[in-house]
């Protein structure tokens, strides 16, 4: 049972009454303190004036970060295949999208540089949005070398990077057909691929984190890490909109992280989550290799929950109209979720 009725002290959280009151836009102190300490432990930002601020999850955080820099008519750089909710968010704001080519590791740095170098729009490109780990929908994960290259292009063209990383802790080992040697080297926290935030020396990365994929999406609890002048503005935006995540949700997270688990217990929980998702990945890939061989191509993901199929059409079907509609109709008839 969670204890949310203690008074504030070292390693403890506020009393329940504190969580049930209105609060400021930075979050209840024990919740906010954990997210900041956790960010320092995992990402160790390389510049001094960084901070964290609460969010209702990464979509909420994305909107607030975007509104700090963008107005109607601006253009946002995104992955060639990007998170559908982002499209639904920016279109009503009359913000255009400039897609950047992807490969098996996500956004291609040379393609990003090409788009920026040859940009002819009236307004300057200022921001690039990417999901570097287990990208939604393709499942692509950037290596550390790819992240360094993307960051270098951002420096060259003076771009702000929105690092939307809800699947960051869902990294696991490469797939092996040898079921006896699976799940022996899960990364936990210490062996994760370093984040873009951890590479940032200029204060140009706005990192979005969430508990949605590792605790529960209904908690609506997340946080933003960025230079303090940005987190301060997001705090002010919170105070005129959401105020902060629901007090009960913050109480649950704060109690787990500060009293029940601590950082070591949190890492043990993440290892178990990584194991669970690795098992699901392996079972799904095993079945795909068994039943879909020759019908589709795919890259086996090393993180997250997405596997991106490329349907292999027979030569005589290529170029015909209506083929994908027939594929879709066949999936519906066979009760396959697309």
Residue ranges with predicted function:
Residues 4-158, 162, 168-199, 277, ...:
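Conserved core of the PLP fold type I
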Residues 29-33, 148, 228, 247-251, ...:
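A structural signal for well-ordered alpha-helical segments within the folded catalytic domains
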Residues 89, 152-153, 233, 276, ...:
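Alpha-helical scaffold elements within enzyme catalytic domains, especially in hydrolases
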Residues 99, 129-132, 162-165, 209, ...:
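Short beta-strand segments
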Residues 171, 227-228, 258, 310-312:
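Residue-level recognition of strand-loop junctions within catalytic nucleotide-signaling folds
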Residues 270-274, 278-285, 296-314:
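Conserved glycine-rich beta-strand-loop-beta hairpin in the small C-terminal domain of fold type I
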Residues 328-338:
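Conserved PLP cofactor-binding pocket of PLP-dependent enzymes
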